[in-house]
Design a protein with these regions (language model features):
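Transmembrane alpha-helices and adjacent helix-loop boundaries
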Residues: 1-234
Length: 234
């Protein structure tokens, strides 16, 4: 086993920056992709999850179809479809940078998982809450907004935390569509420097730090909004 050489991160890449600067830039792209994809996943996943609990059979069918479609196709395949197929079907999208297509692919994939969790959170509530909201004169949308969703979202914070951590880890797949994130950096720099141990050790540490930070932040949020007597509450 050779001696580890951490000074490689201070070496110039030949492009006017060091490998450390390149790695920090790649980390930034990883977090940007993750945050944008999570925002898409939360919005769409919440909407689909809500649709799957409505009295409308058509909306339930649409929500079920969305969930099964995006949940059962491998993430890498979905990214390739977004990157290679969609722009060919819709030429106007060819001008969109690949990173945004990757964000949509990752976001839609995760939305199916969040939809299932939101649906489960709503279904976990006592049925009397829905009936009580309607009985006092609230419309169905108002019942969801003021009665069901505030409770359901508190219940699903733990699984949403897991998905938030997973989306950071799943962003590593976007290297396959030329997103300059951490794995893309690791593959390129380890080949250039012939120091894969040092490179992958640091990349692994950055993934751990990112996911652990999300876990701790969400733990604080969960503690502040937990409902006594409900799942996760005391």
């Amino acid at each position: 086993m050779g001696t580890w050489d951490w000074q490689i991160f201070l070496q110039d890449t030949g492009g006017g920056r060091t490998y450390l600067e390149w790695m920090m830039s790649a980390w930034g792209w990883t977090m940007l992709v993750s945050v944008l994809a999570l925002a898409i996943a939360l919005v769409i996943g919440s909407l689909i999850g809500i649709l799957r609990t409505t009295p409308s059979k058509a909306l339930v069918l649409f929500g079920d179809a969305w969930t099964e479609l995006f949940r059962n196709i491998p993430l890498l395949v979905q990214l390739f479809i977004w990157y290679h197929v969609i722009p060919r079907l819709f030429p106007a999208l060819q001008a969109i940078p690949g990173i945004y297509l990757a964000v949509f692919g990752l976001g839609f994939f995760t939305s199916a998982r969040i939809a299932e969790q939101v649906r489960a959170g709503i279904m976990a509530l006592p049925k009397g809450q829905r009936y009580a909201g309607l009985a006092i004169g609230l419309t169905l949308p108002q019942t969801y907004r003021y009665v069901l969703l505030p409770m359901a979202f508190r219940i699903v914070i733990p699984p949403i935390t897991s998905e938030s951590m997973n989306i950071i880890k799943n962003s590593s797949v976007t290297f396959a569509v030329q997103v300059s994130e951490l794995i893309f950096f690791a593959l390129q720099s380890s080949e250039e420097t012939s120091r894969p141990i040092e490179i992958y050790a640091c990349v692994t540490a950055l993934y751990f730090v990112s996911a652990f930070a999300v876990n701790r932040v969400m733990a604080v949020v969960e503690h502040r909004v937990q409902v006594p007597g409900m799942i996760g509450g005391k």
